[in-house]
Amino acid sequence: MFTAYQDARSWIHGRLKFGVKPGLGRMKQLMARLGHPEKKIRAFHVAGTNGKGSTVAFIRSMLQEAGYTVGTFTSPYIITFNERISVNGIPISDEEWTALVNQMKPHVEALDQTEYGQPTEFEIMTACAFLYFAEFHKVDFVIFETGLGGRFDSTNVVEPLLTVITSIGHDHMNILGNTIEEIAGEKAGIIKEGIPIVTAVTQPEALQVIRHEAERHAAPFQSLHDACVIFNEEALPAGEQFSFKTEEKCYEDIRTSLIGTHQRQNAALSILAAEWLNKENIAHISDEALRSGLVKAAWPGRLELVQEHPPVYLDGAHNEEGVEKLAETMKQRFANSRISVVFSALKDKPYQNMIKRLETIAHAIHFASFDFPRASLAKDLYDASEISNKSWSEDPDDVIKFIESKKGSNEIVLITGSLYFISDIRKRLK
């Protein structure tokens, strides 16, 4: 029995990161031992290589503006560990986490002794989320974001009302597969019998895989790019604006506060999701709530301005496609500015290609490391770069010194490469 939050959290972090046996067997056993909390909630399930967090934020915000109470389970965290489980965007308390772990611990330890093996850290956190929304704090809807992939992700015991797949890109290829088709197959593993699926995936080969899986499960399928048009796109000083035509209606001058050309697509996909919820009488989201929700939606670490002198932006782009979209946005928004990039990445990411894309927008790059088991060495990143104006340090505190050196220079500082890295730097900046 834990009385201290830090002890409860340490117990979670002390668990295995990956299961000895892949699959959903342990999660299904945990759910059964807990009285099947996954069957007691009204949920939506969101998967995809990039755009998951922003799409969750958009859908949550629209539902909130329509008067609903919305829970979310997301990962990784950017500001606090507790934000993984939130209600209306507010993280649960230390006391609630401790109570959840105390209820979970005996079931986990009993499962340790079975043929299913030890539940992992992420499985336990996911089970805590199901338990929280089923018993501790009942809400109108819960949005679950997958952690990795889809088919065998621990969130995939959910019985959703709607499934969303944001995008398919090259990430976690050592686990999900080497081709776009293989990765799409893993993401499409969240499609359930008869449950509607909406997607913003663009690649024809990936769409074919998702469409086939939807047909196999008799799941109504809608593709953003098949049936909808985004037009009149414009970058605003503090967000994006676009118009959007679906099979149902035309939305003129939609605005978001999240910055980036890719956020228009995430917002459009969220509108498509809202249309489904309205059409199926699952929720009622008025046009006013939809528009207001998209403007009010916020998500930390997505081209987030965290300091003004000098301007410092944090962005969690952590794979090739994410960095490509980031570079595209920076070119569009800051064409006449000098940009200094601070970069770090995990060892298993294609950081050489990520660096190449950032070199197209950077005046200078400072390479850093951070305290994480899979973090790259700053020197390795430095050696992979061909830009002439570059520096490196293994000490994350030197990032703060690098930023301070830019005061009065009219340069923009962009910190990117890993969600874990920007979370670490965010704390140091505060």
Swiss-Prot record:
GO BP terms in the entry: folic acid biosynthetic process; folic acid-containing compound biosynthetic process; one-carbon metabolic process; tetrahydrofolate biosynthetic process
Residues that coordinate or bind ATP: G51, K52, G53, S54, Q263, R302, D315
Keywords assigned by UniProt, alphabetized: ATP-binding, Folate biosynthesis, Ligase, Magnesium, Metal-binding, Nucleotide-binding, One-carbon metabolism
Source superkingdom: Bacteria
Binding positions for 7,8-dihydropteroate per the UniProt entry: T114, E115, Y116, G117, F152, D153, S154
InterPro entries from the UniProt entry: Folylpolyglutamate_synth (IPR001645), Folylpolyglutamate_synth_CS (IPR018109), Mur-like_cat_sf (IPR036565), Mur_ligase_C (IPR004101), Mur_ligase_C_dom_sf (IPR036615), Mur_ligase_cen (IPR013221)
Single GO molecular function: dihydrofolate synthase activity
GO cellular component: cytoplasm
Binding site for Mg(2+) 2: H172
Cofactor(s), by name: Mg(2+)
Recorded catalytic activity of this chain's protein: 7,8-dihydropteroate + L-glutamate + ATP = 7,8-dihydrofolate + ADP + phosphate + H(+); (6S)-5,6,7,8-tetrahydrofolyl-(gamma-L-Glu)(n) + L-glutamate + ATP = (6S)-5,6,7,8-tetrahydrofolyl-(gamma-L-Glu)(n+1) + ADP + phosphate + H(+)
PROSITE patterns xref list: FOLYLPOLYGLU_SYNT_1, FOLYLPOLYGLU_SYNT_2
Root EC class: ligase
Residues annotated for Mg(2+) 1 binding in this entry: S75, E145
Listed pathway(s): Cofactor biosynthesis; tetrahydrofolate biosynthesis; 7,8-dihydrofolate from 2-amino-4-hydroxy-6-hydroxymethyl-7,8-dihydropteridine diphosphate and 4-aminobenzoate: step 2/2; Cofactor biosynthesis; tetrahydrofolylpolyglutamate biosynthesis
Cofactor details (free text): Binds 2 Mg(2+) ions per subunit.
EC number: 6.3.2.12, 6.3.2.17
Protein family membership: Belongs to the folylpolyglutamate synthase family.
Its job: Functions in two distinct reactions of the de novo folate biosynthetic pathway. Catalyzes the addition of a glutamate residue to dihydropteroate (7,8-dihydropteroate or H2Pte) to form dihydrofolate (7,8-dihydrofolate monoglutamate or H2Pte-Glu). Also catalyzes successive additions of L-glutamate to tetrahydrofolate, leading to folylpolyglutamate derivatives.
Subunit structure: Monomer.
Protein name, as recorded: Dihydrofolate synthase/folylpolyglutamate synthase
Organism of origin: Bacillus subtilis (strain 168)
Gene name of this polypeptide: folC
